[in-house]
Amino acid sequence: MSFSAFELGRFTGRPVRLFVFTRQHLTWRFANSDRDIVSGGFTYLAARIDRSDIQHTTEREKDQITITFPYLLNPAADPLPVTQALGNQWRPYHPVDVIRVVCMVMHVGDTDPPQVEWVGRVIQPRLSDTEMELTCAPHSSIALARNQGAKFQTSCWKTVYSTGLRGCNLSPGAHRVTGRVARLEQLPTDPPQGAHVLVPDMAAHLAPLAGQVATWTYEAQVPHSGTVASVLKFHVRLNNVTAIAVGTVLHWTAADGIAHHGTVTGLFGTVAVLNTTEGITAGSVCHWSVAEARQGTATILQAYHAYDWVSQAAGGSSSGFSWDDASGLHDAHSGTAWSVTYTRRSALVLSDVTGLEEGSSITVALSGSGVSGTLSAVAGLQLTAAHFASAAYSLEGGTLTYTDANGLLIRRSIASHTLGSTTLTLSAGGPNPVVNDAVTVLPTCPRTWDACAARGNTIHFGGAVYRPLHTPDGVSMSWG
């Protein structure tokens, strides 16, 4: 019989709860039954293990569940329960990495695979002499912490992708950053066509810029030429009038070798009217050039902080600028009679600066955090799409959205994903997409300075970077 048939039957149901715990490459599987259960090629060991009821509420703490199983503190006890090895993961030391939990259910004699009811992680163990109780939180618990207000804390408190003061204003889609060149200089270490450029407007986006492509627009003089077919007073017929307009200056050389030039005052088809035709004859070659917009393109070889410096001493002050990397510098140095202050400036090393000059505006296109694609396979909560592998960040803890058959936009939280993998696992609870559904996935953010810098969004970082690790007066119990 199928799972749904067992569930709908009044007296046929024989439910068995299955539990899967994973810690890196280690896996433990248990069933709350009187005998081992084999399902999907895996063996679930019979154990006296159970969980509390699952709730989905607006309060995060109520969404937690507790899992209890036998665990003996007496090391000489014989025999030890099959769950002893699992309990040992929290004794004598609490693990620093995440232990994940998957709660499933099936029926004895069920022909369907086990149904996933809940996915989360262990957040706290509790021990007695004969039993261990694990408090577990769902994977979506962090994403549910919205509108909590500003906090004086090291990590960022803002809502990812949200806008306004409470949001981090990170763009989920592809976007562009633009800046104006304040300084341009070619150093001996630069490529033949490359140079160092200073772009203050890109200070908040430096980390993701290296390896990207910068573009700009400039005007270049494009040469043209045409042969004179005939001359009648000030009217000159040319075999080529490309880009000629009123005001264009034509240059030609007379038979005696003297160079002349004239300005076009009118144009009728292939006939140009010049303000002078001195020295021009049939067969003369006219030359002209026209400014045309060109796009410059260069690879950003390096993105870092250069710096200005100001030195104060008893004899006076001096200042200057350096292209050296400022990452190892403090903001200031001082002695008894002198001081030096450094100001960081965002700098780029470009592979080619043709047409670029101080005051030019350059643009860098950054790929978005979101990933869109079509599902090629669906196995329960496990989804496969080739585009998942192209995600710049791990999708674990993020959100998957798709449109169902009724046209509703459905959002699902992602339980697990490995960077570079084409497969992800959704958290339990809610409708699932099907094969060929178009989905969009947004990763979450670890809410650290490094993660914010990698996304080029430090200007909106909500954490207190220079917050002391300990309370200044040394007495606060809430200073975490």
Curated annotation (Swiss-Prot):
Pfam assignment, any one: Phage_BR0599
InterPro entries: Phage_phiJL001_Gp84_C
Domain of life: Bacteria
Protein name: Uncharacterized protein XF_0523
